[in-house]
Amino acid sequence: MNIIQQLEAEQAAKIAAKRTLPEFSPGDTVRVNVRVVEGTRTRVQAYEGVCIARSGGGINESFTVRKISYGEGVERVFPVYSPLVESVDVVRRGKVRRAKLYYLRDRRGKSARIVENTGTRARKLNDAERQAISEEKARIEAEKVAAAQALAAEKAAAEAAEAKAAEEAKAAEAAAE
């Protein structure tokens, strides 16, 4: 492995540690949550459409998403490892026989539809994603419970300290009299 490939692999691993993208391929309907900067504000915008291509490799890998907006076809290319891409959700799995679905540009209406994939591979991927999401929710819930318990313990300690201070103040008053 040469130095360039090694650096790209390190960068990809660093980005993948922060967020993980699901496994998706051309034909899948995806929702890409993109961070958009407008003036001083930053917000997350969802872009939902059909993934029509994946290209490149390593850190330069990208995917193209096509949607129809107000009757006009719009395509947008997203780098896989871009920090502006918050997350990618697979809405449904498509069954296609091509790696590049550029023929969808010429199609309108029903002829542009993609059949949903209900095969075993799609089921396994969907089940794996559901499992990962449920584990993530359970982890977040456990963190919330732990934070609530820590907050309750902190409040109890503060109340105990206040009660002790009040007792000491009463004892000091009694001693002063």
Swiss-Prot record:
Instruction: Provide a Gene Ontology MF annotation, just one.
Output: structural constituent of ribosome
User: Which UniProt keyword terms apply here?
Assistant: Ribonucleoprotein, Ribosomal protein
Q: One GO BP annotation here?
A: translation
UniProt-listed SUPFAM superfamilies: Translation proteins SH3-like domain (SSF50104)
Task: Supply one GO CC term from the record.
Answer: cytosolic large ribosomal subunit
Concerning Pfam families, the annotation shows: Ribosomal_L19
Function recorded in the entry? This protein is located at the 30S-50S ribosomal subunit interface and may play a role in the structure and function of the aminoacyl-tRNA binding site.
Protein family according to the UniProt entry: Belongs to the bacterial ribosomal protein bL19 family.
What's the name of the protein? Large ribosomal subunit protein bL19
Q: Which organism is it from?
A: Sinorhizobium medicae (strain WSM419)
